């Protein structure tokens, strides 16, 4: 009866005991932190890697993606930026692949929407002349005869860029806005053993550790500008123009928006002051409403005045009809702007989250702004305002 005592165990049980006794950190190596896909400069990728394809034994890349942003570049690869490149991005929230080489030139969209703020597992695999795209374990795209042999390339180098393009977006087969307000984690890029270089762009990328919700977040001092010529135009008879803001979070004091030109004080402005929303004009009078977060804030502009309303509260600001500098004349000036956030030169402490901004009922996209601060979260907001939300890209 040797080996049948109370301490005797089968080999399988001994392995289970060892696994249970190991510290948790030994059971799984800690994952590196998630990386935000917006670079500090707002231009180009966050990481560029090169690989010697003569040494590659693995021709797939996988990662997890989380975003509320429906459009942007996730991954780009090439052996020649003019003649042989590949791009994986989002358009309308769904994956899109663009391929440009001597074998195939195509743009294909496939798969489910990924802009829901959840983590999604994505894998891109090249098998000979085939490309496979898998999302959350399900194959959503199989492209055949789209690649030639790597051995035919003049240089044995494959370049991978994460979160951007090494050339202008106009050079894509179907241009899109490259900046993607999203996070990537657990990335495995081609064959690590064949990697010859890796470079991360300078600057402090935004943290992915903050829980987010859909919207657009302006940290203190952030600003964006839209040309009035690029916005939906006012109704002609009678003249009317509307702006609607979904103000979800707000703190501090400073401008929310203004109408005017860069070289002059604004004709009309909306500010945060002491938990109030204050509407001011260049003609002196102003009015205010108590700040109510979550309730739509609406500005209705007419020739005779401006109506500010939020929920049941409504105030009307009268405007002079004969002034040549009236609001109506702004729309015929080529440099007239809709300013969001801090005005040029303003030391503002206001930070706020918009879950939407509409001009004449049409939602505006921060990626389409004439110019903007790079620390604006274009398609996401923190769940609450605090010190950890003032980070920049």
Curated annotation (Swiss-Prot):
- InterPro entries the record matches: ConA-like_dom_sf, GAS-SHBG-PROS, Laminin_G
Question: Which Pfam families does the record cross-reference, listed alphabetically?
Answer: Laminin_G_1
Could you cite one Gene Ontology molecular function of this protein?
steroid binding
Signal peptide: which range, if any? 1-27
Tell me where it resides. Answer: Secreted
- Source species, domain of life: Eukaryota
Q: Domain Laminin G-like spans what residues?
A: 35-208, 215-381
Q: What does this protein do?
A: Functions as an androgen transport protein, but may also be involved in receptor mediated processes. Each dimer binds one molecule of steroid. Specific for 5-alpha-dihydrotestosterone, testosterone, and 17-beta-estradiol. Regulates the plasma metabolic clearance rate of steroid hormones by controlling their plasma concentration.
Record-given protein name: Sex hormone-binding globulin
The gene name on file is SHBG
